[in-house]
């Protein structure tokens, strides 16, 4: 960080035993923002060819299946460091995004869902706004980290 003039966003891998170790190290190193989670490492086998389906044997798993893991890791990191977090991993609805905010993400990012629903981000924003109105939140920041 001491050589960077721009904000430093550290994207953390979920392929660790304890995400808080990485979060603390990134915070101590001067990260301005944490981004988590990246993809989980997975493997697919082509049962007809009886070999690996991916050229590198393993690859990144993303999408709805990783969401509960991402929520847990955002929660753990948010409770370990005082660094803003961009929560990502399997977000495909307003409910998914709200979960991330409630456990401590200051912002969210949508990835895989954009491939099959080009309006997903707009739908999520609309859903968050409706949730805020229904639950009397004046701003998104009022929601951040209230689930302890």
Predicted features along the sequence, with ranges:
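Alpha/beta enzyme core
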Residues: 1-86, 92-110
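C-terminal helical cap(s) of enzyme catalytic domains, especially alpha/beta-barrels
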Residues: 45-59, 101, 114-138
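Alpha-helical scaffold segments in soluble metabolic enzymes
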Residues: 21, 25, 76, 113, ...
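Small/polar glycine-rich anion-binding or flexible loop at a beta-alpha turn
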Residues: 91-95, 117, 148
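A short, charged, Gly/Pro-tolerant segment at domain boundaries
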Residues: 142-148
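Residue-level recognition of conserved structural "scaffold" positions that shape functional pockets
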Residues: 70, 96-97, 118, 134, ...
């Amino acid at each position: 960080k001491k050589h960077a003039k721009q904000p430093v966003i550290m994207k953390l891998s979920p392929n660790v035993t304890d995400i808080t170790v990485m979060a603390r190290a990134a915070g101590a190193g001067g990260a301005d923002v944490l981004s988590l989670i990246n993809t989980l490492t997975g493997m697919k086998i082509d049962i007809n060819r009886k070999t690996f389906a991916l050229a590198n044997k393993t690859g990144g798993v993303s999408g709805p299946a990783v969401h509960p893991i991402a929520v847990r890791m955002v929660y753990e990191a948010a409770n370990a460091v005082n660094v803003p977090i961009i929560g990502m991993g399997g977000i495909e609805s307003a409910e998914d995004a709200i979960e991330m905010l409630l456990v401590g993400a200051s912002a969210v990012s949508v990835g895989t869902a954009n491939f099959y629903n080009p309006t997903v981000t707009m739908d999520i924003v609309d859903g968050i706004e409706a949730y805020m109105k229904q639950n009397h939140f004046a701003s998104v920041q009022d929601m951040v980290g209230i689930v302890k």
